[in-house]
């Protein structure tokens, strides 16, 4: 008995002196609504990739502009929103885009029964986009003129910051058309709405990835590297694991198994190969966005993008 008690005391002492290492929190600005780009991060949570890197991922849903403002202020560590992030950088915000998910927009311009074709929007019909200056707003202003519509005169672009609010606005008639994600497009079609055009057929554009504050990138490089290593693993997992990815879509996007599989097939072709884009693509994005945002100054890719860590991680993993 004495021997047993001695062993118990020894075990308790061992537990008492064993250090407990707290995970480092990573506050991540996400769009919400169960979009595929958001689910890349969620997959890393479910698979334990962030915890393997000593990180506790804290996804925080916020509007695109407020989330980027929080990132600039240091209230967020990372943001998923590449389009709004790039716009902020071009205006002088101290941020960098350090990883890219999509190379073409996975968005659809959707309308309900009163609008039959794109030309029917002419006459000040309301079109729901995201924050003014954000990716969806920029893309819409670029695409509409190709189809004979002046975004300033022929339609009224309405800012609906949260992506999850655009589908309800469309279904209730608050707007005549809305730019929706793959998930919400399927839901809208089930309610009798129809697609006017697919943005991915119209142009190249980056809307999702990882944006970070320059100070964090400089002063906490190991933290950023661990976060990106986990995110890169999550990105690869999401692209190649249809069964697991569709299960997450069903959980967060409230989709049926068939619809989730459809969404996965819709978005995979637009994703980048390794989390980066080549320099000529970076230059095209800068030219497009500076024109849309009416920014008249010389901007080179190094002022917007920094893929050095992701490039290093790809070499490290042999990908």
What are the roles of these predicted feature ranges?
Residues 219-297:
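Secondary-structure end/capping motifs
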Residues 134-151, 231-262, 301-305, 314-317:
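Ligand-binding clefts/hinges and TM-proximal coupling segments of bilobed small-molecule sensing domains
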Residues 22-153, 157-160, 166-172, 176-182, ...:
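Short, glycine-/small- and polar/acidic-enriched structural segments
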Residues 84, 163-253:
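Pocket-lining segment of extracytoplasmic ligand-binding domains
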Residues 6-16:
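Bacterial N-terminal signal peptides
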Residues 16, 20-22:
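Boundary at the C-terminal end of the N-terminal hydrophobic targeting segment
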Residues 287-319:
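Conserved C-terminal helix/tail region of periplasmic/extracytoplasmic solute-binding proteins
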Residues 1-4:
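Positively charged n-region of N-terminal signal peptides that target proteins for export
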């Amino acid at each position: 008995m004495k021997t047993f008690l001695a062993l118990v005391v020894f075990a308790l002492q061992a537990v008492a002196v064993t250090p407990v290492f707290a995970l480092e929190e990573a506050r991540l600005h996400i769009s919400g609504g169960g979009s595929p780009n958001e689910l890349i991060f969620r997959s890393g949570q479910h698979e334990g990739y962030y915890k393997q890197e000593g990180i506790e991922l804290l996804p925080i849903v916020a509007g695109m502009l407020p989330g980027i403002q929080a990132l600039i202020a240091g209230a967020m560590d990372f943001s998923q929103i590449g389009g709004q992030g790039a716009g902020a950088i071009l205006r002088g915000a101290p941020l960098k885009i350090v990883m890219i998910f999509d190379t073409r927009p996975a968005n659809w311009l959707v309308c309900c029964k009163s609008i039959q074709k794109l030309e029917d929007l002419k006459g000040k019909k309301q079109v729901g986009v995201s924050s003014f200056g954000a990716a969806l707003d920029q893309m819409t202003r670029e695409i509409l003129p190709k189809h004979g519509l002046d975004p300033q005169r022929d339609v009224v672009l309405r800012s609906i910051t949260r992506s999850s609010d655009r589908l309800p606005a469309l279904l209730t008639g608050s707007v005549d058309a809305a730019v929706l994600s793959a998930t919400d497009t399927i839901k809208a079609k089930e309610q009798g709405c129809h697609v006017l055009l697919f943005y991915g057929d119209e142009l190249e554009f980056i809307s999702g990835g990882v944006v970070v504050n320059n100070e964090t990138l400089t002063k906490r490089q190991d933290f950023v590297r661990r976060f990106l290593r986990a995110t890169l693993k999550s990105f690869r997992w999401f692209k190649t694991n249809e069964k697991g990815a569709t299960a997450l879509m069903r959980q967060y996007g409230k989709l049926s198994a068939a619809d989730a599989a459809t969404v996965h097939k819709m978005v995979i072709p637009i994703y980048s190969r390794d989390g980066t884009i080549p320099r000529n693509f970076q230059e095209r994005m800068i030219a497009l966005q500076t024109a849309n945002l009416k920014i008249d100054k010389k901007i080179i890719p190094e002022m917007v993008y920094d893929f050095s860590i992701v490039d290093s991680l790809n070499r490290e993993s042999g990908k």
